Amino acid sequence: EVVAVDDGSTDGTGEHLEEFAERSAIAVTVIRQANSGGPSGPRNVGLDKARGRYVFFLDADDHLGPEALERMVAMADEHGTDVVLGKVVGVNRTAPKSMWDKTLPRTDVFSSRIKFTLSAQKLFRRDLLTRHDMHFDESLKTGEDALFTMEAYLRADGVSVIADYDCYYLVGREDGKHATKSGGYRLRFDSARALMGLIAEHVPAGKRRDGLMVRPFLITLLPQFGPVFLKDDEEVRRDKLALAKPMIDAYWTEGVADRLKVNERLRVNLAGLGRADLLADVLVFLKKKKAPALHVDPRSRKAYLAYPHFRDKEAPIPDGWFVPTSRETVTIDSFKFAPPRAPERAFGLIPRGGAPAPCVPSGGRSAYRGSDRRART
């Protein structure tokens, strides 16, 4: 079946849908209503009218691959999963990529990268949604799909990922006026707050929660303290810091921080301290697109990325904020710095030629002795 909701279109969409319904070989329900101001309302209307075993939310700008629904339903039926992600490709716009490395017949939100795709364009088992009375939050003007999809991931009995077939074509509008790009900065904080609260409600404090909290901190909150922050006036800066502080106080942990790059961790920490001045200095440095100096302590052999205010006696910033983690890859002079993917903080320096090389501190002495070629952190 197709349930098409015309949310107050003024371009003849309603008439086109009704004409399509008359000649369609499958059941088509057309609902015409006044414009609701966002996607949540029409999605909820369509969801309540749906009667199939599965539902899929298709946005007006986009389209499906010819075999998309067939393949996704078959995947869910074969493996008994409640949510299926079909590979998304961008048309005149970018699309998420990191979760499409390989097809996963059965996974979950904790052991995959699906937390980085929270749009509503997934196949959902309708029984999952009705059993938990799941609907889109119409009070949110942005990020409502992230809240809905994350809840589905957390409640699902398994999630499947189809990576070997282009299921969904995410089409960029020529005018750039996508609903998800509208609204002021306060709406982004509303979205981050709601998503963090949902995760905290469903997942006890610990490594699993920290792993999920990376998503709202990195994708929703942190952009507010990116390049746009330098353009904000003082009043907006103060407001953003005030909005962020309760979330940082409640959900920002060392476990979340250790999963972010140094510059990301610095920005969140400085926002939590309310230090717009120090944050601006870091952003000015990032704007120059230069790699930070690599500082290796000659005594402890600990390594740091020396962003602005590293060991600045006038700034209350601990050295630990500057320690690189496994997400960090920085090219420094003739070296490519790439910490191993390990839980502990450790890294090596590998020159472009491939042979191990020492870390040399400012004093000029090798940072390792004998055969130990790793600067320990």
Report each predicted region and the residues it spans.
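Basic, ligand-binding patches in group-transfer machinery
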Residues: 230-377
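All-alpha amphipathic helical-bundle segments outside canonical DNA-binding/catalytic cores
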Residues: 206-214
